[in-house]
């Protein structure tokens, strides 16, 4: 039911193309995955999302547990039917909220007690509970519960959190019983190579359908992020899909692909879109700026997204300056399409054996726009 098929390999790097087969369709990798935290990519309908070329989205277990609740989603027929998205869905475990809501939680080896940011009540999540929630949601891919520590934690604290992550992985595997849902484990270990290696080997030993690398892009320096991207894949199984969590910049994606990663997610396309910022090549355009008032060109004349085919920078500037919701939607749509197009172009370059010429971030200060 779940299979990862490697379809081509780069001759100079570890980059590869593949097909991740799921019960709700296939994901052609490398692929960017938009974030739909509450079973919605903010401001965008499922039909609009399909137009961007998106093949898989991410939703958040913790937030869906709080509202509307996994039982209601299950009663509706599962998350795909609930949100009218027929393609694959991955649900993260809530491990990131262990990091992002650190001031509102208490952590023990049994799980995490959160203070509900909505009403102040307390919610306890154990690895077993997190898996049960994801089984009720009915996602294609469930993530094992993990402890994502802050990048400022010292090595001893990182090691303690890693042991907890590994213990929770064991419990997650023992609890997960849904044959039509894949379970991925998560590699942690902070910026410490020995801990990353240990975690990668331990997580790989479970022979799960896929594997993720977490604890990246949580405040580290660019150099530290690149170190993890370069180092960890050598300890991961080659024939499994590799998911690098929280990465969405062109340079980091291309570097990650060169090291054998396949799937990526990030909130930036929609977060920036909601603030009027559009992706253009490897730059960002703040369309609130007055210089776009009389600019009747599209965001990107080479882009075939619905926004760029139909609307000018001047019109988008007008919408954003007047706080019109349509502006946020149109820019977010473009930003998602931009990253999907980028990963699609990487796939083509790998198949044509020109990936290192067109997308190698270590060879140029910017990624050549004409290549995609």
UniProtKB/Swiss-Prot annotation:
Cofactor details (free text): Binds 1 zinc ion per subunit.
Residues that, per the record, bind substrate: 92-96, 146, 188, 215
Listed name of the protein: Queuine tRNA-ribosyltransferase
Cofactor requirements of the protein: Zn(2+)
SUPFAM superfamilies: tRNA-guanine transglycosylase (SSF51713)
Originating organism: Prochlorococcus marinus (strain AS9601)
Residues annotated as binding Zn(2+): 303, 305, 308, 334
One Gene Ontology MF term: tRNA-guanosine(34) queuine transglycosylase activity
Residues of the active site: 92 (proton acceptor), 265 (nucleophile)
Family assignment from sequence similarity: Belongs to the queuine tRNA-ribosyltransferase family.
Annotated EC: 2.4.2.29
GO biological process, one term: tRNA-guanine transglycosylation
Record's subunit section: Homodimer. Within each dimer, one monomer is responsible for RNA recognition and catalysis, while the other monomer binds to the replacement base PreQ1.
Protein keywords: Glycosyltransferase, Metal-binding, Queuosine biosynthesis, Transferase, tRNA processing, Zinc
Domain of life the protein comes from: Bacteria
